[in-house]
Structures are given as structure tokens and as C-alpha cells.
Amino acid sequence: MSKEFIRKLKESKPVVAICYDFDKTLSPDDMQAQGYIQSVGDEVESFWKESNGLAEENDMDQNLAYMFTMIRKAHGKVLFTKKALMDYGAKVQLFPGVETWFKRIREYGVDKGVIVEHYIISSGLKEMIEGTKVANEFEKIYASSFYYDKDGVAQWPAQVINYTSKTQFLFRIEKGTLDVNDSGVNDYFKPEDIRIPFRNMVYIGDSDTDIPCMKLINSYSGHSIGVYNPKTKDKRKVYKMMEDKRIKYYTPADYTEGSELDILVKTIIDTTASNEKLMSIHYQDKQEQISRNGQPDNQEDKEKEKLIMDLENSNSFKQTHSIISKLKKIKSWTLEEKKQLKIIAEKNKQISSIMKDGDVASFYSSLE
């Protein structure tokens, strides 16, 4: 049975999408290290060493490796259910200001005439993120997740997100096709019909796994922000990302009101509000120009425009005769089109030299 996907439609106001990694972007540590690893009697360092070793030895995706390792280590020790993972998520610590950040930034957007939406794009576990205090603040949480049996016990990965696959979700956000199975993400949209252009996206992350998303957003004039732990003040990663042109800005991961990050994101919202007014004027002017010039809006008009261009670029008598035979099949020409055809005949020697040939002469006579 096919599913009918719910899609977000273009708004009457500009929309800014702020996309976040989770671990070490909104939270100071990996989510697995804040309760789960300890509950199975393991050390954080040894867990990741084992998981990464499994990936390396078996040519395995690192995220699939950690998901497999989590299931295996939980066996016989703790229940590995969706509820248990959400309970672990409830214990996850957040950086300063995160709990009030999302509502505050949305309200700032409202004051500026901009809709602000928050999204998670993370290689971490969706179930744990859904257990956090801020889970309901997001339009959509894109993260790795498990398939569960009838008893709610995790059996198999349902979704795995790595650093390269993260980028597909930016296109989903762009077009409003948020469901992971909605093939509408491949549909063509005119630039003016795009729900959230990349220029109106902000990506906030902390490490190499965020680079593909940052690079994509940068290439379309969006905004990429690197964050670092405000307690350790270790800026080595953000310096490297800045040097490699992966980010435009960096700040401490301090989400409190008046912080560097708070001021930066509000400035981006201000800029978006002004820029989208200009883009709106541009699209209005473009539409007026199309209407005034009669730019093709049906198949016959498109065919006429193509043939006129082909005739103008013709570089042989044989090609000219072939194009003329197609032009003769068209019964109606506008005054502007007739003018174009006559100018081409005067300027292109491949036409002017054979104006007395029967087919060419009869075609141009029909334009009088």
C-alpha cells in the first residue's frame, strides 16, 4: 500500500532553516557516553576502540559498527528497547542555553518577519535525541535509528546516517519533502518555488563529519558555523575547518542570550530578512519581463524559439534547408518573430546566399 507523504509548502514569509549536529554541538559529549556505555559495564574509550576496530576489520561503516556493538554489549545485561534508549537520552547533558535557545530564536525571527525552523542531522541515535528535553523543538530529527520487534526490542538498523549521507537531508529541507522515503526530493522546482533556498540555511557543527553539509551550504551562499566547547576552549578543529574553507564562522557552543552564537545567528536572520525582500523584487521583475517578452510557455512557442536559434547558427546550406522545412510547418508567427527571421536572413550568408531557392523563397514570402 503506497503512502501519501505530507510535504511542507512554500510560505508567504522567508524561512530560515537552522540545522544542527547533536554530539558536541548541542551536547558536550557523545550521547552513548552519558549512561549507556556505563550501564553495560564498559569504559568509554574501550567501547569506541572496539567499535572502530570492528569497522576497520570488516570494511564496515563506523555508524553501523557502533549500532551493532551497542546491541551486542547490551545482550544479557540491560534491556535494549526504544524506551530504554529514550531514557538514556533524558540523561544527556546540553550546552548552556540550549533549552531556551530554540523558542527564543523562533520568536526573534517572528519579530523580523522570518519563520525559523530547527532541524537535527546527526549520526547519533534518533531514539536518544527523542528522549532529550529539547526533542519537541525540532521540525524533524534525522539520525540513525533501529528497527524494533513487537516487544520493542532493537533488532536491526532502520536508518544509518554517516557524514556523506547527511547532505541528502539538506535537499529534503530545501524542498519540504521531509519524509526519508519521499522520492519527491528529486522533483524539479523553479528557484522562486523553492521552500528554503540554501542561502537561507544555517548549519551548526563541530567536526569532520559535518564537513560535507558545511561545504554544500557554503557553495550556495548559506551559512556554516563551527562550534567548540566553551569550557575547554579547544579551537583546533574550528581553526582547521576555517583554514580549509569549510566554515564561515566559529563560536563557543554557548547558546545563552547575548552570547557570540546568539548574536551571530540573529545577524544572519536580519540579513535574510533584507535579502529576501530583494529576491522577491527580482522574481517579480523577472516574471514581468517574461510576460512582456512572451517567453515560451507552451510546446509550440518553445519549438519556434529553438528553430529560430538553429537558423541563426546554421553553418551549411544543407542544415539551412533542413531547418527551413521545419519552419514551414509552423503556421503562425508574431511580428517580433518575423522580424528576427528577416534579420537572420540578412546576416547569415548560409541563408542570404540561397534566398532564391524555392523552399527558402516561399518560406520568407509567407512572412510578408
Tell where the protein language model's regions lie, with residue ranges.
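Amphipathic alpha-helical segments within extended alpha-helical solenoids and repeat-rich scaffolds
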Residues: 345-351
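C-terminal cap/substrate-recognition subdomain and adjoining C-terminal extension
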Residues: 96-119, 123-339, 352-368
